[in-house]
């Protein structure tokens, strides 16, 4: 099977590419624009594999995408290319509209044209797998808002959309486009919505890598608002396994939620990282006895969702997928990776981002 992966140099995309090349006999065509968050160094372990090809292209370039389809003749598309940071979407929403909505439209149209020209056998086996986020659903009641005997709801595949940020609104729009191309044109599409990912090769604008790297450097650890917001955490390699199961075994027209079964308050995530670093690093930065001393509460993100939590029972029942990592095992692996891969993240931090606060509304 030949799988075209968009955004394969990004955090989740590179995990998908590594999983396919390392654990299957399938081939990958990685199509990536290489924005600030795209990093081919995340793929050095597989870059010379004969089953891996890279195409430097923008999904908004219809001519380039059509040529790539014609040249490589993929059997499936896994669409991960996206602008994905909520804070950046607050200060610069235009890139999110362009890439996440217009780019998805162009990819759908070129995929539809390509698919229509395939033989009947190949047409029947073709898949367009759109990878999205649980943020399209909005937020859920927080345990502090309800009585202790209340059963807290989870996001299911039937949950209505109610996006809160420019990022989540752009992803919701792309989800609707994908489903429209399925219903209107018959394109065999599948949608997945995942919870918060973490793990190796994560660009340090996101909470977990930012906290790890700030702590190592002895910098303050910013926590938005009161830190009580709750997220479900999914180890990225578990997610990559799930996505491969979906593209190879999933049913066209279906949606699958993918979660880690690891609800944690943001402040508890930060304190867990501090505790593990305390155990691993004997020589602390000057002036501190433990890393929790670096925690500082800062102004909250505008429109910050209170709680995300996913019901992943459908993908377990239909495809047999369950996460292998608990939050404790996954976060320990993640911290060890950052401690042992200083060259990777130092080169990232020497580029366009140095850990500054993003997403403030003037």
From Swiss-Prot:
Intrachain S-S bonds: none
Entry's Gene Ontology BP terms: nucleotide-sugar metabolic process; O antigen biosynthetic process
UniProt keyword annotations, A-Z: Carbohydrate metabolism, Lipopolysaccharide biosynthesis, Lyase, NAD
UniProt: substrate binding residues: 84, 133, 196, 206-207, 222-224, 231, 266, 300-304
Record flagged with keyword NAD: yes
Binding site for NAD(+): 11-12, 32-35, 58-59, 80-84, 99, 167-171, 197
Catalytic activity: dTDP-alpha-D-glucose = dTDP-4-dehydro-6-deoxy-alpha-D-glucose + H2O
Cofactor note: Binds 1 NAD(+) per subunit.
Cross-referenced Pfam families: GDP_Man_Dehyd (PF16363)
First-tier enzyme category under EC: lyase
Database matches in InterPro entries: dTDP_Gluc_deHydtase, NAD(P)-bd_dom, NAD(P)-bd_dom_sf
Cofactor(s) required for function per UniProt: NAD(+)
Active-site feature positions: 134 (proton donor), 135 (proton acceptor), 167 (proton acceptor)
Record family assignment: Belongs to the NAD(P)-dependent epimerase/dehydratase family. dTDP-glucose dehydratase subfamily.
Protein name in UniProt: dTDP-glucose 4,6-dehydratase
Organism, scientific name: Escherichia coli
């Amino acid at each position: 099977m030949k799988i075209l992966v968009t955004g394969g140099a990004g955090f989740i995309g590179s995990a998908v590419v590594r999983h396919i090349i390392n654990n299957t006999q399938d081939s990958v065509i990685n199509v990536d624009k290489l924005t600030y968050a795209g990093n081919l160094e995340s793929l050095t372990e597989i870059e010379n594999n004969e089953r891996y090809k890279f195409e430097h292209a923008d999904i908004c370039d219809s001519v380039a995408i059509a040529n790539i389809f014609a040249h490589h003749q993929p059997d499936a598309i896994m669409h991960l290319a996206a602008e994905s940071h909520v804070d950046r979407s607050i200060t610069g929403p235009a890139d999110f509209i362009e890439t996440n909505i217009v780019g998805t439209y162009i990819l759908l149209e070129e995929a539809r044209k390509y698919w229509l020209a395939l033989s009947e056998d190949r047409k029947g086996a073709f898949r367009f797998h759109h990878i999205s986020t649980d943020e399209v659903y909005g937020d859920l009641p927080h345990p502090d808002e309800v009585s202790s005997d209340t059963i807290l709801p989870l996001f299911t595949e039937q949950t209505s959309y109610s996006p809160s940020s420019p990022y989540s609104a752009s992803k919701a729009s792309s989800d609707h486009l994908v489903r429209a191309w399925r219903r209107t044109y018959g394109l065999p599409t599948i949608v997945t919505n995942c919870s918060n990912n973490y793990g190796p090769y994560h660009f340090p604008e996101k909470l977990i890598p930012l906290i790890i790297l700030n702590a190592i450097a002895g910098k303050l650890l910013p926590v938005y608002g009161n830190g009580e917001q709750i997220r479900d955490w999914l180890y990225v390699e578990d997610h990559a396994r799930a996505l491969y199961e979906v593209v190879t075994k999933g049913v066209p027209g279906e949606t699958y939620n993918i979660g880690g079964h690891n609800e944690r308050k943001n402040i508890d995530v930060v304190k867990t990282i501090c505790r593990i670093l305390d155990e691993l690093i004997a020589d602390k930065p000057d002036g501190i006895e433990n890393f929790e001393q670096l925690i500082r509460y800062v102004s909250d993100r505008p429109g910050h969702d209170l709680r995300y939590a996913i019901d992943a029972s459908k993908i377990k029942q239909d495809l047999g997928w369950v996460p292998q990592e608990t939050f404790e095992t996954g976060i320990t692996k993640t911290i060890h990776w950052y401690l042992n891969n200083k060259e990777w993240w130092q080169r990232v931090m020497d580029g366009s981002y140095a850990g500054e606060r993003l997403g403030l509304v003037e």
